């Protein structure tokens, strides 16, 4: 049997929390045509003359709040996960990390796999729910870099794992461990948002309030539907009553209509309607990052408290949890 490569792709982060490094990262990220779907002549001035100069100083301060000794949280947890995964997979796979908008790059990871002499490469976008802006964009980047490097090893793609038993099971375990002996009035599942225009590309999406719960091929391929499927699987495993949990979408950018309800609005409403003790779970992220630790862990808590909330619990992402490492190894071997 030939040697196999496994390429773990995540978005990455700035090299440091210095403003210039944050500017560079934001520019690379937002100039991706799958992230901001405008023609280049419109996207370039929007990103580099408007968004980045305004957001970079603010974002740099937020990165500083959550920065770890070894680097940004997403980079640290991704490296740890990859190292443990390599131990678990032993010589069945050569595991490498490629970050879309920072180092180590997808190109450098593919070079390493090429030099290792692998016969095929499984590309694993580390985003549980499928979206063109994440899974689609990362695989296209891998294809472009493979072509540039004249790779002979074929690329295969790991499907979205929004309903994978080990991903759901590890998430449930982390909820139980975090909230042991704690009183919780409501569980909020906060997923990364998308512009509605991205979701409407799937026929039938957002046509009715319950379209994401319909059992059809369209819902099966819809990011929003996959978010609800993940939340439902976790909630049911925790035996939560439907009235005790809800879904919201975070990290909106710009003036376009994004998926609703917004997480900050949901936190405000929950506090104002008497939910004193809440838990927030972020299952569109496999690694804690600025969006979970700062936006939700710090900013979300402030919003909740400002409107009358009391206890606020943030459940960690699956990160490098041993149960998740084992489960992901099993998933990879099954492909």
UniProtKB/Swiss-Prot annotation:
GO molecular function: ferrochelatase activity; metal ion binding
Identification of the protein by name: Ferrochelatase
Disulfide bond positions: none
HAMAP family the record matches: Ferrochelatase (MF_00323)
Keywords from the UniProt entry: Cytoplasm, Heme biosynthesis, Iron, Lyase, Metal-binding, Porphyrin biosynthesis
InterPro entries for this protein: Ferrochelatase, Ferrochelatase_C, Ferrochelatase_N
Transmembrane segments: none
Catalytic activity: heme b + 2 H(+) = protoporphyrin IX + Fe(2+)
Pfam families listed in its UniProt record: Ferrochelatase
Job description of the protein: Catalyzes the ferrous insertion into protoporphyrin IX.
Family, similarity comment: Belongs to the ferrochelatase family.
Residues the entry annotates as binding Fe cation: 192, 291
Location of the protein in the cell: Cytoplasm
Gene Ontology cellular component list: cytoplasm
Superkingdom of this protein's organism: Bacteria
EC numbers on record: 4.98.1.1
Gene3D superfamilies the record matches: 3.40.50.1400
Any single biological process term in GO: heme biosynthetic process
Listed pathway(s): Porphyrin-containing compound metabolism; protoheme biosynthesis; protoheme from protoporphyrin-IX: step 1/1
């Amino acid at each position: 049997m030939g040697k196999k490569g496994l390429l773990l792709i995540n978005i990455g982060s700035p090299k440091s929390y210095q403003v210039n490094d944050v500017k560079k990262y934001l520019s690379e990220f937002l100039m991706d045509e799958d992230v901001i779907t405008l023609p280049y002549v419109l996207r370039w001035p929007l990103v580099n003359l408007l968004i980045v100069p305004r957001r970079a100083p603010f974002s740099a301060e937020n990165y500083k709040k959550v920065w770890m000794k070894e680097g940004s949280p997403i980079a640290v947890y991704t490296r740890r996960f990859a190292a443990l995964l390599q131990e678990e997979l032993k010589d069945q796979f050569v595991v490498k990390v490629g970050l879309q908008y920072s180092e180590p790059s997808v190109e450098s990871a593919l070079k390493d796999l090429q030099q290792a002499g692998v016969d095929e490469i499984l590309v694993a976008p580390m985003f549980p729910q499928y979206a063109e802006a994440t899974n689609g964009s990362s695989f296209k980047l891998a294809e472009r870099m493979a072509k540039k490097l004249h790779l002979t090893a074929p690329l295969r793609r790991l499907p979205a794992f929004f309903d994978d038993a080990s991903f759901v099971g590890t998430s449930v375990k982390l909820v139980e461990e975090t909230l042991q002996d704690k009183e919780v009035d409501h569980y909020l599942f906060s997923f990364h948002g998308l512009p509605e225009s991205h979701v409407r590309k799937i026929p039938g999406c957002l046509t009715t309030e319950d379209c994401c719960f319909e059992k059809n091929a369209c819902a099966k391929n819809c990011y929003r539907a996959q978010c609800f499927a993940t939340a439902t699987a976790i909630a049911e495993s925790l035996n939560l009553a439907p009235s005790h949990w809800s879904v919201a979408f975070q990290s909106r950018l710009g003036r376009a209509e994004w998926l609703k309800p917004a997480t900050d609005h949901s936190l405000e409403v929950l506090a104002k309607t008497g939910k004193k003790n809440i838990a927030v779970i972020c299952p569109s992220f496999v690694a804690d990052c600025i969006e979970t630790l700062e936006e939700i862990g710090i900013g979300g808590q402030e919003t909740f408290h400002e409107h009358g909330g009391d206890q606020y619990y943030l459940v960690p992402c699956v990160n490098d949890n041993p149960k998740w490492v084992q489960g992901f190894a099993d998933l990879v071997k099954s492909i």
